[in-house]
């Protein structure tokens, strides 16, 4: 499913969509944990997640996250598309369904 379609799905869900920063409208083929995500996969990152320190090592093409300037700055510098919501865990669950 195209990333823009996933954004539309999340907008209609319960995770309280804030914004999306799409650098490339890629086809998302699957979802995975941030530490094992591959290209064309989406993952999520909560604000206080220990995996935040390893963000530069992920191969995920898109990440669902909260409105945290530090995380958003890192994602932008890594050119990783992101979907910003109030509750990344709920949005990730919505994507899995």
What are these regions (language model features)?
Residues 1-97:
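Terminal amphipathic alpha-helical/low-complexity segments used for targeting or macromolecular assembly
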